[in-house]
Amino acid sequence: MAEALPPRSPPDDVDIDPDFGPQSRPRSCTWPLQRLDSQGSPGKPNSGAGEAADTSSMIPEEEDDDYEGAASTATVLGTAGDKGTLVLLSGGESGQLAVLASPVGGVETLQVSLGGEGAGGAVSGAGGQQQQRKCSSRRNAWGNMSYADLITRAIESTQDKRLTLSQIYDWMVRSVPYFKDKGDSNSSAGWKNSIRHNLSLHSRFIRVQNEGSGKSSWWMINPEGGKGGKAPRRRAVSMDNSNKYTKSRGRAAKKKASLQASSDATDDSPSQLSKWPGSPTSRSSDKLDTWTDFRSRTNSNASTISGRLSPIPATTELDDVQDDDSPLSPMLYNSPGSLSPSISKPCTVEMPRITDMAETMNLNDGLPENLMDDLLDDISLTSSQQSSPGVLMQRSSSFTYGTKGSGIGSPSNNFNNTGSFNFPLTSLRQSPMQTIQENKQATFSSMNHYSNQSLQDLLNTDTLSHSDVLMTQSDPLMSQASTAVTAQNSRRNIILRNDPMMSFAAQPNQGGNLVNQNSLHQQQSLNSFQGGSRALSNNLSNTGLNDSSILESTKHQQQSSVSHSMQTISDTLSGSLYSSGVTLPTLGHEKFPTDLDLDIFNGSLECDMETIIRNDLMDADGLDFNFDTLISAQNVSLSVGSFTGAKQTSSQSWVPG
């Protein structure tokens, strides 16, 4: 296309390519669309060259700007008379442009016909002379110069070698003919955006803060000489092209391997608990402190101190463990005497804690009788201080209450001279069973540690409901029976209810266990109480009533007669016999001191506690126990610390069974 310019000096000494005619392109952006007349020159087009240009090669896409091999040059090709024409073109490999000065009108007519790669350009003047040239296809609509080249020339054309963004826009519109008619806001959006991108992405341009306030920054050429062309295009970070995730996966694998190695190394230590697979403490040592804080809650389905999901004995796992390697699992004793009430220290906080946990455990699934038989055969409670710390409370087939440190007893029914008291446990009938496995040694304290007020608190509190089974360390101190009472009864339906809590007092320095297990009894006749030469001791009063209403219920039960004859029980109860309306008299301190000197009992004392508990306490039809007199007389009670439950007297009537 030929373009006539007024005869004036070129701005900034930059040659402008007059060949801005429409080009054949597969797409259109801000570049001119393809027209039928490919030669948009105001002069007469060359039809032959136009035909060639109409089907000539497409303008290729803008290549990467790392093309520094072909230096762009701007050359003033010539003038005709006092008229001049600026031609801006790229100095390609064989690019040649012949300018024929026209003698007519002083205006040069420049026509370039672009063919394929290496096609010659025919330049025709007014005289029709033509000259061919070889050149490559143009990279852009305004020529082969890129935006970066134009920006560079714009900045270098100034005296201060710096321009603002708006000044660069003005230079483009003023110096490059292609942008002359694209200076308005509607048509300048595309190329101005390209200018901004090139300024930001090219390392050859730097931005300098303008000293004036509220003014745009200066754009300058990088004095350090940035690399030519655009910077590599940045890609969005993904899991495919980023090594961040690879590094994180590697760190995680290394950490896991180190933890595994440390865990394997600590397994060899006898103090580690990883050999206990059922214990939550079978972890690495760095996590041991955290887990032991709440292991008793997380390892039980009832949120109690029980370390197992059910009272089913787990002797298979524990038999292989040495006694000195006792775990921190709450189902085992920590030490022979640790945290256990002793003679010198009253039990102040143990009782409420156990009672609270007793309420939380409620196994409502009925268990078959044969399963309960197996369970009870494995239960063993011993107060021996010589027992190993790892002894489970579920081992033997009898409860042993010893005053001389007796060991695990056999299921016998005799009460020997040493004061040990053995009675068999029979199966519980299919009923909701609740159990507590205490993790401390269960011992008894002497009677003088407790006061009447604390016993009243125990009787008035409702924390021990009649449906709870309690295995506790409290000392309601029912004295050891010294009568010779035997009965013919099968090993079934022993009922240790927690409402009349039965406990057995040993000597002040000895220990025993109190077991209250709630199970519904099966009605079975008891033949008779036989024999009897000794007395039930003076502390039958403290049967551990949980509800104050038991006093009324026992009085209510006296209206029916005792179905089985009871023989002489004691010669120390002031001649009182167990019969209808028997009231236990107040005993003098001179004969039965509060420390229960058991040496006053002579001979062999035999007692079938199953019969006593079953018949006298649970089915006592005609017994009237007067507890108030003995409580005041003996000053025997429990010191239970501070119960968590509210102290209120229940008015409900307790009915056994």
From Swiss-Prot:
This is Forkhead box protein O3. Residues 1-71, 216-320 are annotated as: Disordered. InterPro entries: Fork_head_dom (IPR001766), FOXO-TAD (IPR032067), FOXO_KIX-bd (IPR032068), TF_fork_head_CS_2 (IPR030456), WH-like_DNA-bd_sf (IPR036388), WH_DNA-bd_sf (IPR036390). Transcriptional activator that recognizes and binds to the DNA sequence 5'-[AG]TAAA[TC]A-3' and regulates different processes, such as apoptosis and autophagy. Acts as a positive regulator of autophagy in skeletal muscle: in starved cells, enters the nucleus following dephosphorylation and binds the promoters of autophagy genes, thereby activating their expression, resulting in proteolysis of skeletal muscle proteins. Triggers apoptosis in the absence of survival factors, including neuronal cell death upon oxidative stress. Signal peptide: none annotated. GO terms for biological process: apoptotic process; cellular response to oxidative stress; positive regulation of autophagy; positive regulation of DNA-templated transcription; positive regulation of muscle atrophy; positive regulation of neuron apoptotic process; positive regulation of regulatory T cell differentiation; positive regulation of transcription by RNA polymerase II. Localized to the animal hemisphere during early cleavage stages. At the late neurula, localized in the anterior neural plate, neural crest cells and in the hatching gland. As development progresses, expression becomes less localized, being observed in a variety of organs and tissues including the head, branchial arches and somites by stage 32. One of its GO terms (cellular component) is cytosol. Residues 246-257 have a biased composition (Basic residues). GO terms for molecular function: chromatin DNA binding; DNA-binding transcription activator activity, RNA polymerase II-specific; DNA-binding transcription factor activity; DNA-binding transcription factor activity, RNA polymerase II-specific; protein kinase binding; RNA polymerase II cis-regulatory region sequence-specific DNA binding; sequence-specific DNA binding. Residues 142-236 bind DNA. Residues 268-283, 297-307 have a biased composition (Polar residues). Residues 284-296 have a biased composition (Basic and acidic residues). PROSITE patterns: FORK_HEAD_2 (PS00658), FORK_HEAD_3 (PS50039). It holds the Pfam family FOXO-TAD. It comes from Xenopus laevis. Dephosphorylation may promote translocation to the nucleus where the protein induces transcription of target genes and triggers apoptosis. Keywords: Activator, Apoptosis, Cytoplasm, DNA-binding, Nucleus, Phosphoprotein, Transcription, Transcription regulation.
